[in-house]
Amino acid sequence: MKTAALFVSKEFEEEAIALVEGANYKVTSIYKLPKSPNVKFYIQYDKLQQIKNDEEISTLIIFEQLKPRHFINIRRELKGKEVLDKILLLLEIFALHAGSKEAKMQIELARLKYELPIIKETYTKSKIGEQQGPLGAGTYGVESTIKFYKRRINKLMKELESIKIFKEKSIESNKRNNIPSIGIVGYTNSGKTSLFNSLTGLTQKVDTKLFTTMSPKRYAIPINNRKIMLVDTVGFIRGIPPQIVDAFFVTLSEAKYSDALILVIDSTFSENLLIETLQSSFEILREIGVSGKPILVTLNKIDKINGDLYKKLDLVEKLSKELYSPIFDVIPISALKRTNLELLRDKIYQLATQLS
């Protein structure tokens, strides 16, 4: 297993460690991010030298978005060590869990579009003699790399557009067959996949590591002799970078093109975190074009809740209705223990009937 030094702010330390471990790295040391980033390296130079001289560390991970100059300067210092920021870390995790050709294409597109400005700045520096190129290739090598990236990006965008058109036609076909589709959305580890499994009887992989659902899974279930299509979508992340939202449009659009949504919220969160989660969830849905379709909010993991369930339920219901319309209903459940699952099935049937 590769070893990593991790730079992260205290408030995101737990999430960052889970992400790094989810990418199959062993965190050997943790450093706080500087309050005032170093202009040249982002992190403190003395800390960079510690990592440079530590032979046990193979990778430096900075849980923030770096500028191209930071990558160039850090990589020049840490020759032989891998350097990742938050976005490259997320893309590496996505690549590990990609289950379809489409997902792999989306990940490659996101990575190429993110790395291209770094290579362009490397080219600029190589022309004035500051940098020898990404692999010591010099100006000509960097020019060739830039041309390759641009060609590959254009090809991937065309292929993904074709997939998008095909999916839209497939969705329209389902609508003509009077099969309503309901997307299950929410943050990673909120219990989306557990709920999908409980409702469908399937056994998708459920993992404590983040991002186990990369390609949306679709499955039709019968409720009161009515066929309803359920879709388990890719999970949200906090502070999701716009580059990833754009690159994963086709995957995230499963939510946009669903007739209705089930938003899964983790009831074990504190009230402040519940508020933050609801606000960011509805913001992400707006960003991908969700508007006007009914949303059924589920407060999940009530078997593990600490505190007053009804107080949290009241908070979630009130805030959800302030942030979005129409909210079909808000109900407490435990996907794992199957608490209130029959009630949820009834609500899904009512929702599907309303859509007809």
UniProtKB/Swiss-Prot annotation:
Residues 180-356 form the Hflx-type G domain. It holds the Pfam family GTP-bdg_M. The keyword Transport does not apply. Changing G235S: Decrease in GTPase activity. GO terms for cellular component: cytoplasm. Mg(2+) binds at T193, T213. SUPFAM superfamilies: P-loop containing nucleoside triphosphate hydrolases (SSF52540). Keywords: Cytoplasm, GTP-binding, Magnesium, Metal-binding, Nucleotide-binding. It is found in: Cytoplasm. GTPase activity is stimulated by the presence of 50S ribosomal subunits. Hydrolysis is probably regulated by the HflX N-terminal domain. It comes from the Archaea. Its cofactor is Mg(2+). GTP binds at residues 186-193, 211-215, 232-235, 300-303, 334-336. One of its GO terms (molecular function) is GTP binding. Belongs to the TRAFAC class OBG-HflX-like GTPase superfamily. HflX GTPase family. Monomer. Associates with the 50S ribosomal subunit. Does not associate with 70S ribosomes. GTPase that associates with the 50S ribosomal subunit and may have a role during protein synthesis or ribosome biogenesis. Specific for GTP. This is GTPase HflX. The lineage of its organism: Archaea, Thermoproteota, Thermoprotei, Sulfolobales, Sulfolobaceae.
